[in-house]
Amino acid sequence: MNVSKTEQDMRKAIEATAGNFATIRTGRASTSLLDRINVEYYGQPTPLKTLATITTPDASTVLIQPYDPSSLRLIEKTILESDLGLPPSNDGKTIRLNIPPLTAERRKDLVKVLRNLAEEGRVAVRNIRRHAIDEVRKEEKDAKVSEDEARRLQDEVQKLTDKSIQQIEKLFEAKEKEITTV
């Protein structure tokens, strides 16, 4: 049983959760809003950031400048179909996304989405824990480790799990505060 691998897997789960949190808009323009957007470009789902320069000229605008002008319509269509809820405005060369101030209702909805993402992160950490503990039990059954050593490893995995879930909770609280702050 390798505890460091379990710790590494849990760290990856936390990073993935933090990445998901970054894609939730908070009323301020951010290029990370578009990180999850994949455009169907020449039959391949392609990340938007590889097809265009994405900038934030001011606090409420995201500017998308495609490298290939012919992809402008595809990008616009993809953004419209996405769950961003932001209508793109196309001027023929660039696409602008105006980030409106969040309404109280939209803030509540975003907190719900955030809560679900946090729960997904916690579930991922728990799955890693379950896998690690199963591995310890198997090693104990196969007499590779003693009962005391197995108990110690399980306790260590549980401590890692608690620490990881606590980190996800801190990330959630920080992002929730960011969303709910007017």
Swiss-Prot record:
It is found in: Cytoplasm. Its main location: cytoplasm. InterPro entries: Ribosome_recyc_fac, Ribosome_recyc_fac_dom, RRF_sf. Keywords: Cytoplasm, Protein biosynthesis. One of its GO terms (molecular function) is ribosomal large subunit binding. It comes from the Bacteria. GO terms for cellular component: cytoplasm. Pfam families: RRF (PF01765). One of its GO terms (biological process) is translational termination. Responsible for the release of ribosomes from messenger RNA at the termination of protein biosynthesis. May increase the efficiency of translation by recycling ribosomes from one round of translation to another. Belongs to the RRF family. This is Ribosome-recycling factor. It comes from Gloeobacter violaceus (strain ATCC 29082 / PCC 7421). The gene is frr.
